[in-house]
Swiss-Prot record:
Top-level taxon of the source organism: Bacteria
Organism this protein belongs to: Teredinibacter turnerae (strain ATCC 39867 / T7901)
Name of the molecule in the record: UPF0246 protein TERTU_4575
CC annotations in GO: cytosol
NCBIfam families documented for this protein: PRK02101.1-1, PRK02101.1-3
Record-level GO BP terms: response to hydroperoxide
Pfam families noted in UniProt: H2O2_YaaD
Length: 256
């Protein structure tokens, strides 16, 4: 069983890391090729491409210029510890044990606009490049064209090694669009988190993102390899809702 999640725009390169282990991203050569193109952009081009302020455009221009191989612990840190969005608040990897990191390294992957697919302990330098960014490149009009079948092929590698041919999709739609389900050698289950509001269950973005991280941590800390056991997830008041679920979409609801 393999879990996939999205990266985050917010980063943490200051907190002390709780593990000395690190690995190298599998698609680093592709990332380097992509970065060669990004380095040609002026600060205002970065702002326009990403739809961000001039200040953030300059920050990410500088990140592109500073990005260089080899990635080491001096200029990069482990992906699971570098990202700091709502999903990662829920994951709380800074409190992982050595066993948690080992299990995550086998069973968790992070989809990335720059790196394609990341293992939790793969070193990443500071960057921002969302998968939906329409950055024209030698392979096509955007990042989906750039990555083509490579993301799916990279996910198939651990899927072949794991006992259960199931992929738990805890990534956003923007990132999961980089995966080609027809070529994925796994059944896809997408957990959905809904909260009670104004008389009905709704997806509330902040809560849903955090819940994706919480479920990832639940699977990792309990070393779950049987997808059916995910239905027992009850952290933060969520419960599996069989009436709202189907084979490919498992709905978890919460009344606050």
């Amino acid at each position: 069983m393999l879990i996939v999640i999205s990266p985050a725009k917010n980063l943490d390169y200051d907190s002390p890391v709780p593990t000395a282990k690190s690995t190298k991203a599998a698609l680093l050569d592709d990332a380097s090729e992509l970065m060669d193109g990004l380095k040609t952009l002026a600060p205002q081009d970065v702002s326009q491409l990403m739809g961000i302020s001039d200040k953030l455009g300059l920050l990410n221009y500088d990140r592109f210029q500073d990005w260089q191989l080899p990635l080491t612990k001096k200029n990069a840190r482990q992906a699971l510890l570098a990202f700091k969005g709502d999903v990662y608040v829920g994951l709380d990897a800074y409190n992982f044990s050595a066993e948690d990191f080992d299990f995550a390294q086998q069973h968790l992957r992070i989809l990335s606009g720059l790196y394609g697919v990341l293992k939790p302990l793969d070193l990443v330098a500071p960057y921002r490049l969302e998968m939906g960014t329409r950055f024209a490149n030698d392979r096509g009009k955007d990042l989906y064209a750039f990555w083509g079948d490579k993301v799916t092929a990279e996910l198939n590698k651990p899927i072949k090694k794991l006992a259960s041919n199931t992929l738990i999709n805890l990534a956003s739609n923007e990132y999961f669009k980089s995966v080609k389900p027809a070529h994925l050698q796994a059944q896809i289950i997408t957990p959905v988190f809904k909260d009670w509001k104004n008389g009905t269950y709704k997806i509330i973005s902040f809560f849903a993102k955090k819940a994706r991280g919480r479920m990832s941590a639940y699977i990792i800390k309990n070393q779950i390899t049987d997808p059916e056991l995910i239905k027992q997830f009850d952290w933060d008041g969520y419960q599996y809702n069989s009436a709202m679920s189907d084979a490919g979409q498992w709905v978890f609801t919460r009344k606050q």
